[in-house]
From Swiss-Prot:
Physiological role: The carboxylated form is one of the main organic components of the bone matrix, which constitutes 1-2% of the total bone protein. It acts as a negative regulator of bone formation and is required to limit bone formation without impairing bone resorption or mineralization. The carboxylated form binds strongly to apatite and calcium.
Protein localization: Secreted
Positions with a binding annotation for Ca(2+) 3: E24, D30
Origin: domain of life: Eukaryota
PROSITE patterns associated with the record: GLA_1 (PS00011), GLA_2 (PS50998)
Any GO MF annotation of the entry: hydroxyapatite binding
Gene name for this UniProt entry: BGLAP
Protein name, UniProt field: Osteocalcin
Organism of provenance: Felis catus (Cat)
Residue numbers bearing the 4-hydroxyproline modification: P9
InterPro entries: GLA-like_dom_SF, GLA_domain, Osteocalcin, Osteocalcin/MGP
Binding site for Ca(2+) 2: E21, E24
């Protein structure tokens, strides 16, 4: 039983989240990520993920 206001534990943090945010701040990277996926777009703009 969980007390009211308490939900499930937070999910494990995504180690790629900081890089995903960098890509999202670059409009060209963000647009490319919509087409080919975040990891491939990041790799094209910034090198290895």
């Amino acid at each position: 039983y969980l007390a009211p206001g308490l939900g499930a534990p937070a999910p494990y943090p995504d180690p790629l989240e900081p890089k995903r945010e960098i890509c999202e701040l670059n409009p060209d990277c963000d647009e490319l990520a919509d087409h080919i996926g975040f990891q491939d777009a990041y790799r094209r703009f910034y090198g290895t993920v």
